[in-house]
């Protein structure tokens, strides 16, 4: 068996095109374009790359984009004051603070300061709680993007056994909630899980988000499984690889995301989708 590639770039492009078409419709009716404020603290190289891609995506779909590049020495109170200002701005539908923040800043307090109806990252406890209660509002971007990838396979996943390896607040935990909502029997594995291999081998759907290069051996993949690899790791030779050993996994799986070009593009596309949703549902 050789897996079909889940083309995240192509699917993300279709999402952005749908959003752009809707923005054009709004403008034609005399309605304002959605607005996204992107806040970057410090000069972390990876964060600058991510923020750049988010700003470009905004321009591409016709959003109003406001950028705030802040010194790494900014105080907690100064950052919270900026968030309050953006919360009160009627032209801004989404507020995004790029994580991680410098060590002296409390990211939990920052996330909780953003109004839930402007929390387009989907990190606020209110939005995660809505997902847990099966009444989702603004959903965390990477998990929501992966659900879009699953939908595009055409496979009916209700009743399947889904295994999520990794339990971060950003990916693993909310992805578990998304899969439960979709009717999967869901197992979450983490650093304290004993016998990881036995769980992975049972997975009809495998999601891996641990940030360790080729952490899951390809031979563990159940024949016919769907594999969603969230990891993006750079080897010493410069090659980018995921958290799953791709060449062997692709011989076992029915569908698999490549790295790069799989899950990553969907995160930004879903952020754009969430910002349009926030504009139309909460602020129009």
From Swiss-Prot:
Sites where the protein binds NADP(+): 166-168, 232
Catalytic reaction equation(s): (6R)-5,10-methylene-5,6,7,8-tetrahydrofolate + NADP(+) = (6R)-5,10-methenyltetrahydrofolate + NADPH; (6R)-5,10-methenyltetrahydrofolate + H2O = (6R)-10-formyltetrahydrofolate + H(+)
MF GO annotations: methenyltetrahydrofolate cyclohydrolase activity; methylenetetrahydrofolate dehydrogenase (NADP+) activity
A matching Pfam family: THF_DHG_CYH_C
Top-rank taxon: Bacteria
Function: Catalyzes the oxidation of 5,10-methylenetetrahydrofolate to 5,10-methenyltetrahydrofolate and then the hydrolysis of 5,10-methenyltetrahydrofolate to 10-formyltetrahydrofolate.
Protein name: Bifunctional protein FolD
Organism: Tolumonas auensis (strain DSM 9187 / NBRC 110442 / TA 4)
């Amino acid at each position: 068996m050789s897996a079909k590639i889940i083309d995240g770039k192509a699917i993300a492009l279709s999402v952005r095109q749908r959003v752009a078409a809707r923005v054009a419709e709004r403008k034609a009716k005399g309605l304002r374009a959605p607005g996204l404020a992107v806040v970057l603290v410090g000069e972390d190289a990876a964060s600058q790359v991510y923020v750049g891609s988010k700003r470009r995506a905004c321009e591409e779909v016709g959003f109003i984009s406001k950028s705030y590049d802040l010194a790494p020495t900014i105080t907690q109170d100064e950052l919270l004051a900026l968030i309050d200002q953006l919360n009160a701005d009627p032209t801004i539908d989404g507020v995004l603070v790029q994580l991680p923040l410098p060590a002296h800043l409390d990211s939990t307090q920052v996330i909780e300061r953003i109004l839930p109806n402007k929390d387009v990252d989907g990190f606020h406890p209110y939005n995660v709680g809505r997902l847990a209660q099966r009444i989702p509002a603004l959903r965390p971007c990477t998990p929501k993007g992966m659900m879009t990838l699953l939908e595009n396979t055409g496979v009916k996943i209700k009743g399947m056994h889904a295994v999520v390896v990794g339990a971060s607040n950003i990916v693993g935990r909310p992805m578990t909630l998304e899969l439960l909502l979709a009717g999967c029997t869901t197992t979450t594995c983490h650093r304290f899980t004993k016998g990881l291999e036995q769980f992975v081998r049972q997975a009809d759907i495998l999601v891996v988000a641990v940030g360790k290069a080729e952490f899951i051996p390809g031979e563990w993949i159940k024949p016919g499984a769907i594999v969603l690899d969230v990891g993006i790791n750079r080897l010493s030779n410069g090659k980018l690889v995921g958290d799953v050993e791709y060449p062997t996994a692709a011989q076992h799986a029915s569908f698999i995301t490549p790295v790069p070009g799989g899950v990553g593009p969907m995160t930004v596309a879903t952020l754009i989708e969430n910002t349009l949703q926030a504009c139309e549902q909460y602020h129009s």
